[in-house]
Amino acid sequence: MGSESQGNQTDAQKDRDLFKATLPFGIESVKTSWWVVGSTFLLLLGALFGAALAPAWPIRLLFSVLSALLMVRAFIMYHDYMHNAILSRSRPAWWLFRLYSALALTPPRSWQKSHNFHHGHVGKIDAPSIGAFALMTTDMWREASFAKRVAYRVERHPLTVLGGYFTIFFLSVTLLPFLRNPSRHWDSLLVLLGHGTLIATLWILGGFDVAFYVVLLPMTIASAIGSYLFFAQHSFEDMHVLPTDTWTSRRAALESSSYLKLNKVMRWFTGNIGYHHIHHLNVRIPFYRLPEAMAAVPALQSPVTITLSLKDIRACFKCCLWDEGLQRMVSYREFTRAAAAV
């Protein structure tokens, strides 16, 4: 009993010490925040105008792809704003990000509630899949009904992840919360109306091609990138899923969240979200200070690392179930083979 208590105290102390080490980086520079937000949204606006007005479709396509990448970067800023990491007291930022939420299909009430739950429960074996992709253990899978297995496989299927514009942002983040609780998630209706009105207006004024290149295509690409980044950073080969009694915020950050190693260009477009283990440790660190925190805190410098290589992407999608006996993620095929061998 005494040794168990001492171990828990040690874990608690480690949590406090590591969190304390990150505190200096949780202080934003308002000037820097406005620079990165302002420049990103101006570039996004310019790219969207290019996608709408360029004289030839190949140029419009390039502008549309650029818009998608800038949408990803803008989303990270919206995400940081919702965590109160940047510009939390700014009224202009409040309006800017509310308008952006309609383009990105991310109503503030639904997003903030589910995402905060995710931060408080990521990596827990028995946590509900709120704000995250569902995760079953092999024991849960063994006991699950056929219908539950089908729903689980559909939710974690690559097409569901890559079709995130419809499956994640339209359905899970926006429409379903409103249908479940209209009075609480009234802003989801505003987001749906705003998003639909934007598409309809562009279609009426400029034709389907304008709506396609300005909203439909870039949102499809940006949502696929964003959904995969979120999936991969909590579903990878060397991750750990922890029982509630041994779960701590530090272990969730370092063992259940990955570091996505990217080149400088993709780090810029993804707003340093690859430093996900640090973000989960301290959500108040602005995205532009995450590399600084990693460089300064030795305990953050040996994370589980993944990349965007095809090998790593395939490996992430093969991480389907948590095997408590093996203490690792396994594929459906591995589970079936192991079950047949018993």
Spans of model-derived segments:
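Non-catalytic, topology-defining segments of multipass membrane proteins
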Residues: 1-70, 77, 94, 101-216, ...
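Juxtamembrane/interface helices at transmembrane-helix boundaries
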Residues: 61-63, 206-217, 221-233, 238-242
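Histidine-centered catalytic micro-motifs
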Residues: 74-83, 111-123, 229-238, 269-285
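Helix-loop junctions on the outward
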Residues: 80-92
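Short alpha-helical scaffolding segments that buttress acidic/His motifs in well-ordered protein cores
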Residues: 99-100, 269
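A glycine-rich, aromatic-flanked flexible loop/lid motif
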Residues: 192, 264-271
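Membrane-interfacial segments at transmembrane helix termini in multi-pass membrane proteins
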Residues: 227-265, 308
